[in-house]
Design a protein with these regions (language model features):
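Short, charged low-complexity intrinsically disordered segments located at boundaries
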Residues: 60-72, 94-101
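Conserved GNAT-fold acetyl-CoA-binding loop/helix
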Residues: 46-67
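A short helix-loop-beta-strand connector motif used in the catalytic cores of GNAT acetyltransferases and
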Residues: 54, 67-82
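Acyl-donor (CoA/ACP) binding surface of acyl/acetyltransferases
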Residues: 1-33, 37-47, 80-195
Length: 195
């Protein structure tokens, strides 16, 4: 019975370290740093994200987010991480391995964001490179998927630099910033060479 429980409801992943970054599960104590980084990055992030609710940066909304994160991990649906700069433990962004499908699929979808003041410094590249082995070797996924808006050159570069291959083009794939947007579809398989 313990084996079944481990497979169906894994514990949250431990912190993951990469080149200059540490990834760990978000905690309520991260609220101040998270809300400040998101607020100062609002203009930078909103073209690439779903519309933010009016209370998105409130403590109550963050508390609800923490509850959802815990439930998603408990049920093996998603694994969220905040990304911290290793040298001073400053929050620089976040990523999530979500929409986990078990059974014959063994796949999940990646989402990520980086604060405006930390963009183009290699933090998200290091974070993805650190997460990929855990996704394949610890969570035992076979396939990782990601999608990005065709005009998001930084995201395209990030995915290709971390070994994702473009697989397609999806029309009006996600509602981003209030508009149904086309997306490029990327994937990476367990058998693909590690970057």
């Amino acid at each position: 019975m313990a084996l079944f429980r481990t497979i169906s409801s894994p514990e949250p992943l431990p912190p993951i370290t990469g080149d200059g970054v540490t990834l760990r599960t978000p905690q309520m104590t991260d609220f101040v740093a998270w809300s400040a980084l998101r607020e100062e990055s609002r203009e930078f992030l909103t073209p690439w994200e779903p519309t933010w609710p009016s209370d998105d940066l409130s403590r109550a909304a963050f508390r609800q987010r923490m509850r959802r994160y815990a439930e998603d991990q408990r049920t093996d649906q998603a694994y969220p991480f905040f990304v911290f700069r290793k040298e001073d433990n400053e929050l620089v962004g976040g990523l999530v391995l979500a929409n986990i499908r078990r059974g014959v699929a063994q796949s999940g979808s990646l989402g990520y964001w980086v604060g405006a003041s930390h963009a183009r410094r290699g933090y998200m590249t290091a974070a993805l490179r650190a997460l990929i082995p855990s996704a394949f070797d610890v969570l035992r996924l076979h396939r990782l998927e990601a999608a990005c808006i065709p005009t998001n050159v930084a995201s395209i570069r990030l995915l290709e630099k971390t070994g994702f291959q473009r697989e397609g083009y999806a029309r009006e794939y996600l509602c981003i910033n209030g508009i149904w947007q086309d997306h490029l579809l990327y994937a990476r398989l367990r058998v693909d060479q590690r970057p």
